[in-house]
């Protein structure tokens, strides 16, 4: 929240960063953008579900290298962060605790929608699983039609 002091272990609140701030936070970072924007020490307030939504709106692959995003991609990412998170806050205002999870799900386009059509282009929403995490994305909107490798079975094949 704006004006609320942040604990030292957290990065700046996702709704408080400017495009220039975001560029500075990502500069030189060799991590995958999905991992970087969910790292609360880098940017606070973005979890797994909303990172999927933000990257979908921004049309950025979850596997893109954070520090190599173009200026246009940074602008799209910043705008997507603001719109997705602001919309989530608007939808949750006045909701009781029992209703929050359902309200959150009602606004999701790709997260937890594996196998369903993308609401933007109609392609099938895909999932990549690795370790104890997974993410959902649209190949057409985010990766130029390329399906990303699912790491779910790779540890069993070694």
Swiss-Prot record:
Start and end residues, zinc fingers (FPG-type): 109-143
Matches recorded under Pfam families: H2TH, zf-FPG_IleRS
Keyword Phosphoprotein among UniProt keywords: no
Alphabetized GO MF terms: DNA-(apurinic or apyrimidinic site) endonuclease activity; endonuclease activity; hydrolase activity, hydrolyzing N-glycosyl compounds; nucleic acid binding; zinc ion binding
GO cellular component: a single term: plasma membrane
Transmembrane portions of the chain: none
Keywords: Metal-binding, Zinc, Zinc-finger
Record-level GO BP terms: cellular response to oxidative stress; DNA repair; nucleotide-excision repair
Protein name: Uncharacterized formamidopyrimidine-DNA glycosylase-like protein
């Amino acid at each position: 929240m704006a004006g609320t002091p942040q604990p030292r272990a957290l990065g700046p609140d996702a709704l408080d960063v400017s495009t220039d701030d975001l560029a500075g936070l990502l500069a030189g970072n060799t991590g995958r953008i999905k991992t970087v924007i969910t790292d609360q020490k880098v940017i606070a307030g973005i979890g797994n579900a909303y990172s999927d939504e933000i990257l979908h709106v921004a049309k950025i692959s979850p596997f893109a290298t954070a520090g190599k995003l173009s200026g246009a991609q940074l602008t799209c990412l910043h705008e997507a962060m603001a719109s997705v998170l602001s919309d989530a806050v608007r939808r949750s205002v006045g909701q009781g605790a029992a209703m929050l999870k359902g309200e959150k799900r009602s606004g999701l386009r790709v997260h937890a929608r594996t196998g369903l059509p993308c609401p933007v282009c109609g392609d099938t929403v895909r999932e990549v699983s690795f370790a104890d995490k997974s993410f959902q994305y649209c190949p057409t909107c985010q990766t130029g039609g390329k399906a990303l490798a699912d790491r779910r079975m790779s540890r069993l094949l070694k």
